[in-house]
Amino acid sequence: MSFDLIIKNGTVILENEARVVDVAVKGGKIAAIGQDLGDAKEVMDASGLVVSPGMVDAHTHISEPGRSHWEGYETGTRAAAKGGITTMIEMPLNQLPATVDRASIELKFDAAKGKLTIDAAQLGGLVSYNIDRLHELDEVGVVGFKCFVATCGDRGIDNDFRDVNDWQFFKGAQKLGELGQPVLVHCENALICDELGEEAKREGRVTAHDYVASRPVFTEVEAIRRVLYLAKVAGCRLHVCHISSPEGVEEVTRARQEGQDVTCESCPHYFVLDTDQFEEIGTLAKCSPPIRDLENQKGMWEKLFNGEIDCLVSDHSPCPPEMKAGNIMKAWGGIAGLQSCMDVMFDEAVQKRGMSLPMFGKLMATNAADIFGLQQKGRIAPGKDADFVFIQPNSSYVLTNDDLEYRHKVSPYVGRTIGARITKTILRGDVIYDIEQGFPVAPKGQFILKHQQ
């Protein structure tokens, strides 16, 4: 049999092992894995490289339409490809209008035409004003629904995203349970965080440490406990977003051990940055939940290696530089991290801390694909989409602003020495990023809809 592509001599991350083996591709799918596979139109030599499943980033904010000056599909998905991401799951907020019904998601599909370098699945929003329209988004094909129990959205903009109160969350979760959809939750206690933040501003406490103190660990833990219980009573599968504390992870682990259908994610910045570094970097490292102290970070590493965190995500949420100006308490909270997930975590988890390659593959790709039903993604296995990323181990470089593909070339990782490099990203058998050639093909990304899986 003749193939379109054979990748030879790379250390390939398979589901339960990593070994030097060849991978054959035909028609955009993985056709065979083994030795002496035969002929191909193209052969790539991956000697000395790790061949990983393309990352499935389950938490990405692209702000188009409506706020394309924050981030757009063209720049955001190019950055993703350069960072080894082949599939993103896009959040329903930051764009205007927020993705809360059929009409608003159709606007996103139109805005993205011809701009997607990678594939993209969609989340719908569960907000205070759309519980009677959740079925519309399910029918279109979203893979889950995001909500906030922390305060969010601009009250001066009618069609911006909104947080939900406990009643709205419960009613929404009941409906999503009936639809067979998971609810994804940003877990921080809204009232306590808001009041602590206002108190800090009144008293002139505006450092990074002050911001972290205004969103303490217990506000995350309390919110996780609350939504765990409400989702359980409502009969809805729960996914806890961007957990920042080991105590928060423990709540999820306990519920899972008791039989609840719950998963969780975290982000690289909670593992590689701490509060002192946040103080030094400034507002570019502001996010919520916040980056915490070194002791907290050590606890997060323990939870990650214990298998208590299901997947790692970017939570890429950039904004124009002027929104990061001024003191930390007033600046926009969101990190530009889409391009720096795979290489940073390969360096920190695999090279520095000894994580196995199969575990790395699960955290960066396989588990997210499974959680959100992306059946063709997340694995190097026959029949799956031929999505790969080539990683060059022990190849250090210093990230510069010019390296970035974002709409605004800023990131808290700029200036960081990263000990591994992404050299090639392949989507459905085609090279979409190469370290030497850049982006050699026109955007070929597609939207992934639930009912097409």
Curated annotation (Swiss-Prot):
Catalytic activity: (S)-allantoin + H2O = allantoate + H(+)
Keywords, sorted A to Z: Hydrolase, Metal-binding, Purine metabolism, Zinc
Matches recorded under InterPro entries: Allantoinase, Allantoinase_bact, Amidohydro-rel, DHOase/Allantoinase_Hydrolase, Metal-dep_hydrolase_composite, Metal_Hydrolase
A single GO BP: allantoin catabolic process
Pathway entry: Nitrogen metabolism; (S)-allantoin degradation; allantoate from (S)-allantoin: step 1/1
Cofactor(s) of this protein: Zn(2+)
Record flagged with keyword Metal-binding: yes
Enzyme class, broadest EC rank: hydrolase
Keyword Hydrolase among UniProt keywords: yes
GO cellular component, one term: cytoplasm
UniProt PTM comment: Carboxylation allows a single lysine to coordinate two zinc ions.
One example GO MF annotation: cobalt ion binding
A Pfam family recorded for this sequence: Amidohydro_1
EC numbers: 3.5.2.5
Record-listed Zn(2+) 2 binding positions: K146, H186, H242
Residues holding Zn(2+) 1: H59, H61, K146, D315
Residues with PTM N6-carboxylysine: K146
Cofactor remark: Binds 2 Zn(2+) ions per subunit.
Top-rank taxon, per record: Bacteria
Subunit: Homotetramer.
Protein family according to the UniProt entry: Belongs to the metallo-dependent hydrolases superfamily. Allantoinase family.
Function recorded in the entry: Catalyzes the conversion of allantoin (5-ureidohydantoin) to allantoic acid by hydrolytic cleavage of the five-member hydantoin ring.
Protein name: Allantoinase
Lineage: Bacteria, Pseudomonadati, Pseudomonadota, Gammaproteobacteria, Enterobacterales
Recorded name of the encoding gene: allB
